[in-house]
């Protein structure tokens, strides 16, 4: 026991394999089990329908990653109960971290594309995600929807 403690202190391993602190590692979970997927932090068994990314060695690193992903892709993080009973846009929408699918500020198709781009990015296919955003930016510019084109440009710059 003492030898193990000394080795841990000396080498600072990134993961404590035995999880002696009774915690499980956090994962980024994109829940795709219903029409409007959400992004959340998840610990424990991977039973939910969706995509798990991780494990992260520290929950603070995961929370920082989630904030950056919210700024870039604007996926919702609210619980389903809150999502279904919302009558006006939330604070996350006001500070531009959510696209507002709960109150209809984004179409279902566009939100699904944002989810797909997020998953591609997290799977390491960032070139595909950026290409997809570029195509959507061009399409918005051709339709003279310059606000949407600027939003997509900002997403690309964030990545």
What are these regions (language model features)?
Residues 1-159:
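Acidic, glycine-enriched active-site microenvironments
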């Amino acid at each position: 026991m003492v030898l193990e403690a000394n080795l841990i202190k000396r080498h600072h391993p990134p993961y404590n394999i035995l999880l002696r602190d009774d915690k499980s590692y956090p994962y980024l979970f994109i829940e795709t089990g219903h029409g409007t997927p959400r992004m959340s932090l998840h610990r424990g068994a991977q039973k939910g329908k969706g995509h798990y990314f991780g494990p992260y060695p520290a929950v603070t690193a995961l929370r920082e990653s989630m904030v950056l992903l919210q700024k870039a892709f604007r996926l919702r993080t609210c619980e389903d109960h809150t999502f279904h009973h919302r009558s006006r846009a939330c604070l996350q929408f006001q500070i531009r971290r959510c696209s507002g699918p709960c109150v209809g500020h984004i179409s279902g198709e566009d939100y699904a594309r944002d989810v797909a781009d997020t998953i591609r990015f997290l799977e390491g296919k960032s070139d595909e995600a950026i290409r997809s955003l570029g195509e959507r930016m061009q399409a918005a510019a051709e339709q003279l929807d310059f606000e949407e084109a600027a939003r997509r440009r900002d997403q690309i710059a964030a990545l």
